[in-house]
């Protein structure tokens, strides 16, 4: 089974970013009781793990097309400052950049 590396890295980065933002906000944790411990996994999966949405975000035909993949990520994450990131000019040419 082949796992596309770039989407996995992007998703893990977003998860780390989400965790870091939650930690910086100082969210208070609830007490763990038997009632909310038993209801925890179902609520967690329904809230955070929407597999159909993730599959529609990364289509298989876009994995080899870096520009289509980058544009897809830009559409999915419009709140990031994309001008601060380096441009993908080097990926457009068939010849490698001179070093």
UniProtKB/Swiss-Prot annotation:
One GO-annotated biological process of the protein: cell differentiation
Name used for this protein in its record: Keratinocyte differentiation-associated protein
PANTHER family: KERATINOCYTE DIFFERENTIATION-ASSOCIATED PROTEIN (PTHR36463:SF1)
Gene that specifies this protein: KRTDAP
Localization terms from the record: Secreted
Keyword tags: Differentiation, Secreted, Signal
Function: May act as a soluble regulator of keratinocyte differentiation. May play an important role in embryonic skin morphogenesis.
GO-annotated cellular components: extracellular space
InterPro entries per the UniProt record, alphabetical: KRTDAP
Extent of the signal sequence: 1-22
Keyword Secreted: yes
Main location: secreted
Tissue: Highly expressed in skin, but not detectable in any other tissue examined. Expression restricted to cornified/stratified epithelia and not detected in non-cornified/stratified epithelia.
